[in-house]
């Protein structure tokens, strides 16, 4: 949050700030912390010592640019160098060298890393904060059982529980529990120290039996008893150093390391003053926790809410990268130890450079970015998607929850989420409530807590002043917080006497004088996606959730358009996404073209490259269009070029189109949408999609594969687009089945397949004749388009043969068509059902045909009335040539503020354009419209307007699929499933019932045999169909039935069937 120099005013923080602040924290603090933990390494004879000098570490600037790293499939990383010393203790000599430890992937200003040419982002994780938590549960008798759970920094748990006899146990697993006296003794306390450090010594003495006294008589006895209980070991184990090490590794390291945050939380909860650098659980902690547990039993103290955000911590990108660095340095330590030992055994003189290898660090980070669940491929469908992806919060991942084990209470909205986690924006399906989104103003504090800003109100010198505070979830419970519906920042302005406020997770109505804090912004509670929905306060939250998800699926259109009705955040979203090109210096434009803009300033000439037809990982087209003219003087920060889905530096995901809410011959039944052919012919909803096809050359046992145009046994028609090297030419139009890259793979043919002249050459001259198999890259079904780019990448490797990858990029122009999905910004989504000629569409009183017809029944039941306000205000804005930016919850200005604004704008539009039908007082917002087929008016007036409608990535071209023949599963011999595998349509149990119900026996038999898994019958069908014969009936069982028989046999069940003769009742047994 940035103050702009005035009291009580502020600007919205950068939306990518949370990511690159975390990365900066890792570089500035985490890197030094982990390097300083690297131990001094000695050989077995203690003659040589290896150590790192952390103060001299250096990160080198990358040698390649981000764009080159993407094109060449490389990692945009920095090399880490550290000074290392090798000390010979006998001669006291030291050799110091600057060594290369490995590559650390860098993050750009947008919070994105590039690993192996792929844009990746690390999302933040919410974990249970380490510390102690008290809870109460009812047992089977209905009696409250109190427990205290100590959670370590690693996620390990140790439970303290008190039973009916007031005995305190430590539960180390679900079945094993041990007396707290034994645990404290095993951790180093004697009985006297225990009784001196507790508030209720008589309770501890009450369950001290003679057997218990023997167990805690000495530390060794206590450790042996604890080891037996913890490891479930029978017999009498003997106390030894190895036993202590095993216990240390299995129990104390996993369950007793609290970390910095855990130590702070336990000190605060148990009123202790143990130093912050003491990060392990102490006997004093255990005894204080037991005291609090006894207090809970007697009704003193408060239980903990596990779902409160004060009991959670955010594991940010800094923590994840620091953990990986620690893991890599531990591996490096083992490598150095092994190398020193090997050098001494072979009597070699080691040097610091010879001892260290860069492999552990480089491979650890590559595997982290490639395999870790919290490192995800950046979704680049549109600019909004890129920003929202980096602001996700996940309960899932290592150390977190899973979609199947998380209960409803964890998924639900909690009052502590206010201003920190968006109550609306979450995923749909099994992960609902487990993946959330940060609120706009939230930030991550020093202790891993989510902080939200508030204005503090206080009086000084009879003058009301305002100051901004960032509060963690544990702090804002103690303040009366006004809920943001009080308008003035200045106390001089008369306020309402009573205002709604929040206090200790309750909503109250209090006098204005009692308010301590107030919200700073109407958007403070929402994420970016939810903040882009106008009139969100008039929508049901479920529909707002759908809308915030669907905006991220909007496809950038070929001709973008600003929304007439917006919320005011569109500009910042576009700027922070990095999609528009922005001037970094002021100067004068020398020239502009589609590839670059040349700018002169401060005596220098700067060339700014523009993105041209770049493919995103969702196959959408990223493209920049210059917005400045030659000779124009520009200032720093001015927009030079608009990107995909931005116009004038504002987010533009869809189009403002004329819509009517009315039924039309059933074509908009169940959310279907009727559209005009104008949207197709006018390229209103046309988008470009770029697909990538690649092929790699390998070295086989018979020799290397070749890229060539000379492909035998293929029609010349398929090879028409290849150049002399065998690669498709730029700009050529390709159809399904065309060869994109010609490739031959060598193989040795059998003796019988040689031609006579080949056999003669082999017999006389001994020449080995090899044949080749064509393994060309062919364009799959649905891939037709224009070749816009070809890249031939040679991978750098240590082998003698470096594989080559050839990538072909093909652009498709897609108009809107039947089956495509469209949506508004209020969760109103639908599939195009029919494209009508413009003359048949309903038309307005001024003769304009509408572009789209929605079903009016989709509004009242879904309770998303915001679309009606947007629709009507959009119509007024288009007639008045105005754009509106409306903050949410405008009802705080006055009652019915939204309706008054819309009606007043419609009335003004009606007056200025001399069109009385725009605002008719009898039915405001509605109008009489006419049937385009007959010219007659419809019976009822209809709501018409101009809402902002998006075209989504779910397009029929990517989904439609058919199969004539293809691959079969090896076991069941049935067709595979799915479009990607060229699979078949499943005929399930209910489909069989439907066919049985209509008595179509032959069709049913075909479905279950020829078209499915009867191997011999389906082979015979082809031949008989070609010659025109009758299709033979299958005599034996299909393969899936045979599979069932085999599975029954594996369970020792034999299945047979018999034929009984009608004449003599002879039984003939037949094999199944």
From Swiss-Prot:
Molecular function via GO: DNA binding; DNA-directed RNA polymerase activity; ribonucleoside binding
Cross-referenced Gene3D superfamilies: 2.40.50.100, 2.40.50.150, 3.90.1100.10, DNA-directed RNA polymerase, beta subunit, external 1 domain, DNA-directed RNA polymerase, subunit 2, domain 6, RNA polymerase alpha subunit dimerisation domain, RNA polymerase Rpb2, domain 2
UniProt-listed GO biological process terms: DNA-templated transcription
Annotated catalysed reactions: RNA(n) + a ribonucleoside 5'-triphosphate = RNA(n+1) + diphosphate
CDD domains reported in the protein's UniProt record: RNA_pol_B_RPB2 (cd00653)
Recorded GO CC terms: chloroplast; DNA-directed RNA polymerase complex; mitochondrion
HAMAP family, per the entry: RNApol_bact_RpoB
Subunit structure: In plastids the minimal PEP RNA polymerase catalytic core is composed of four subunits: alpha, beta, beta', and beta''. When a (nuclear-encoded) sigma factor is associated with the core the holoenzyme is formed, which can initiate transcription.
Family note: Belongs to the RNA polymerase beta chain family.
PANTHER family named in the record: DNA-DIRECTED RNA POLYMERASE I SUBUNIT 2
Protein name: DNA-directed RNA polymerase subunit beta
Organism expressing this protein natively: Arabis hirsuta (Hairy rock-cress)
């Amino acid at each position: 949050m940035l103050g702009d120099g005035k009291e009580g005013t502020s600007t919205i923080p950068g939306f990518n700030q949370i990511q690159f602040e975390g990365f900066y924290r890792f570089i500035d603090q985490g890197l030094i912390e982990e390097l300083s933990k690297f131990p001094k390494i000695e050989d077995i004879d203690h003659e040589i010592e290896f150590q790192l000098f952390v103060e001299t570490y250096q990160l080198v600037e990358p040698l390649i640019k981000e764009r080159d790293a993407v094109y060449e499939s490389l990692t945009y990383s920095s090399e880490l160098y550290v000074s290392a010393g090798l000390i010979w203790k006998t001669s006291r000599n030291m050799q110091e060298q600057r060594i290369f430890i490995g590559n650390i992937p860098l993050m750009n200003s947008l919070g994105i890393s590039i690993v192996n040419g792929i844009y990746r982002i690390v999302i933040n994780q919410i974990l249970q904060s380490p510390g102690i938590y008290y809870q109460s549960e009812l047992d089977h008798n209905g009696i409250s059982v109190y427990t205290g759970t100590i959670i370590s920094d690693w996620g390990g748990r140790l439970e303290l529980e008190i039973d009916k006899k007031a005995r305190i146990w430590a539960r180390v697993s679900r079945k094993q529990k041990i007396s707290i006296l034994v645990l404290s003794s095993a951790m180093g306390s004697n009985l006297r120290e225990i009784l001196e450090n507790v508030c209720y010594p008589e309770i501890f003495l009450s369950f001290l039996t003679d057997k218990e006294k023997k167990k805690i008589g000495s530390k060794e006895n206590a450790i042996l008893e604890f080891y037996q209980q913890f490891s479930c070991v029978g017999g009498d184990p003997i106390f030894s150093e190895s036993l202590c090490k095993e216990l240390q590794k299995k129990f104390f390291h996993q369950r007793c390391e609290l970390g910095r945050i855990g130590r702070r939380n336990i000190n605060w909860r148990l009123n202790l003053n143990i130093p912050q650098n003491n990060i392990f659980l102490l006997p004093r902690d255990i005894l204080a926790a037991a005291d609090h547990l006894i207090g809970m039993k007697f009704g003193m103290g408060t239980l903990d809410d596990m779902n409160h955000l004060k009991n959670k911590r955010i594991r940010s990108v800094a923590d994840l990268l620091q953990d990986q660095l620690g893991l890599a340095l531990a591996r490096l330590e083992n490598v150095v130890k092994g190398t020193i030992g090997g050098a001494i055994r072979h009597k070699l003189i080691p040097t610091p450079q010879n001892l260290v290898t860069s492999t552990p660090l480089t491979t650890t980070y590559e595997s982290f970015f490639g395999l870790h669940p919290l490192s995800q491929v950046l979704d680049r469908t549109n600019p909004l998607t890129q920003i929202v992806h980096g602001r996700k919060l996940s309960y899932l991942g290592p150390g977190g929850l899973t979609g199947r084990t998380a209960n409803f209470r964890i998924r639900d909205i909690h009052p502590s989420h206010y201003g920190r986690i968006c109550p609306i924006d979450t995923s749909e399906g099994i992960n609902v409530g487990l993946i959330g989104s940060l609120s706009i103003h939230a930030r991550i504090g020093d202790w891993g807590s989510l902080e939200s800003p508030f204005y503090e109100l206080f009086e000084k010198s009879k003058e009301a002043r305002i100051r901004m505070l960032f509060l963690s979830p544990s702090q804002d419970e103690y303040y009366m917080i006004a809920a943001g519906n009080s308008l003035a920042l200045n106390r001089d302005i008369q306020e309402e006497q009573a205002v709604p406020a929040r206090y200790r997770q309750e909503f109250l109505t209090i006098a204005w004088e009692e308010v301590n804090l107030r919200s700073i912004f109407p958007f403070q509670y929402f994420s970016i996606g939810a903040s882009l929905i106008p009139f969100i306060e008039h929508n049901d939250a479920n529909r707002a959730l759908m809308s915030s998800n669907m905006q991220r699926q909007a496809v950038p259109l070929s001709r973008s358009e600003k929304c007439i009705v917006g919320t005011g955040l569109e500009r910042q979203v576009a700027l922070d996404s990095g999609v528009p090109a922005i001037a970094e210096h002021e100067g004068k434009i020398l020239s502009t073209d589609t590839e670059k803009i040349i700018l002169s300033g401060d005596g220098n000439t700067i060339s700014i490259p523009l993105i041209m037809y770049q493919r995103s990982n969702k196959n959408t087209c990223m493209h920049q269009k210059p917005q400045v003219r030659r000779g124009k003087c520009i200032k720093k920060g001015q927009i030079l070029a608009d990107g995909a889905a931005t116009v004038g530096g504002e987010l533009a995901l869809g189009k403002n189109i004329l819509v009517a809410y009315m039924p039309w011959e059933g074509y908009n039944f169940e959310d279907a949408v009727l559209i005009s052919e104008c949207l197709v012919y006018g390229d209103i909803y046309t988008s470009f999609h770029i697909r990538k096809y690649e092929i790699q050359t390998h070295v086989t046992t018979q020799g290397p594969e070749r890229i060539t145009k000379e492909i035998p046994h293929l029609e010349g028609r398929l090879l028409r687009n290849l150049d002399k090297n065998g690669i498709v030419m730029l700009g050529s139009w390709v159809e399904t089945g065309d060869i994109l890259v010609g490739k031959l793979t060598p193989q040795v043919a059998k003796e019988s397949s040689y031609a006579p002249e080949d056999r003669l050459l082999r017999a006389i001259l001994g020449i080995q004749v090899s044949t080749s198999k064509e393994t060309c890259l062919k364009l799959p079904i649905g891939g037709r388009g224009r070749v816009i780019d070809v890249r031939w990448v040679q991978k750098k490797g240590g082998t003698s043969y470096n594989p080559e990858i050839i990538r072909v990029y093909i652009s498709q122009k897609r108009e809107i068509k039947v089956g495509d999905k469209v949506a508004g910004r209020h969760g109103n989504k639908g599939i195009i059902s029919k494209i009508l000629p413009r003359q048949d569409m309903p038309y307005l009183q001024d003769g304009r045909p509408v572009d789209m017809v929605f079903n009016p029944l989709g509004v009242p039941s879904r309770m998303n009335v915001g679309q009606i306000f947007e629709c009507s205000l959009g119509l007024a804005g288009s007639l008045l040539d105005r754009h509106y930016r409306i903050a949410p919850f405008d009802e705080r200005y006055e009652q019915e503020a939204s309706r008054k604004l819309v009606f007043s704008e419609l009335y003004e539009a009606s007056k200025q354009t001399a069109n009385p039908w725009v605002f008719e007082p009898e039915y405001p917002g509605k109008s009489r419209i006419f049937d385009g087929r007959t010219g007659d008016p419809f019976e009822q007036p209809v709501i018409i307007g101009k809402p902002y409608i998006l075209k989504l990535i779910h397009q029929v071209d990517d989904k439609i699929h058919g199969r004539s023949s293809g691959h079969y599963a090896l076991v069941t011999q049935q067709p595979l499933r799915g479009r990607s595998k060229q699979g078949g349509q499943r005929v399930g149990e209910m489909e069989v019932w439907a066919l049985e119900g209509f008595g179509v026996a032959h069709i049913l038999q075909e479905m279950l045999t020829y078209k499915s898994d009867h191997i011999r019958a389906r082979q015979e069908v082809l031949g008989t169909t070609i010659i025109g014969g009758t299709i033979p009936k299958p005599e034996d069982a299909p393969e899936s039935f045979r599979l069932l028989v085999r599975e029954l046999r594996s369970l020792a069940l034999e299945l047979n069937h018999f034929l009984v003769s009608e004449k003599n009742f002879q039984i003939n047994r037949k094999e199944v």
